[in-house]
Amino acid sequence: MSKPANNLQDIFLNGARKNRIPVIVYLTNGFQIRGIVKGFDNFTVILECDGKQMMVYKHALSTITPSKAILFNTPAGTDDRS
């Protein structure tokens, strides 16, 4: 069985996580969360904010803005979410 290709969402979040790029997460209710992506799955994103961990459900996310550009030239087949 072949492994599915990475989608842009996974590449973006994995790039932010691996490079410890600070992000601003905008929720659908307008609230902003500033932190570092620690992990993610199909339904949630784990952020570290002020030394604390926060789990945010993806259905509540509006926008994620990184503090610097995230490169999308990840080699195929490198899905490392942990």
From Swiss-Prot:
It comes from Clostridium kluyveri (strain ATCC 8527 / DSM 555 / NBRC 12016 / NCIMB 10680 / K1). InterPro entries: Hfq, LSM_dom_sf, Sm. Belongs to the Hfq family. It comes from the Bacteria. Residues 10-70 form the Sm domain. Signal peptide: none annotated. The lineage of its organism: Bacteria, Bacillati, Bacillota, Clostridia, Eubacteriales. One of its GO terms (biological process) is regulation of RNA stability. GO terms for molecular function: RNA binding. The gene is hfq. HAMAP family: Hfq (MF_00436). This is RNA-binding protein Hfq. RNA chaperone that binds small regulatory RNA (sRNAs) and mRNAs to facilitate mRNA translational regulation in response to envelope stress, environmental stress and changes in metabolite concentrations. Also binds with high specificity to tRNAs.
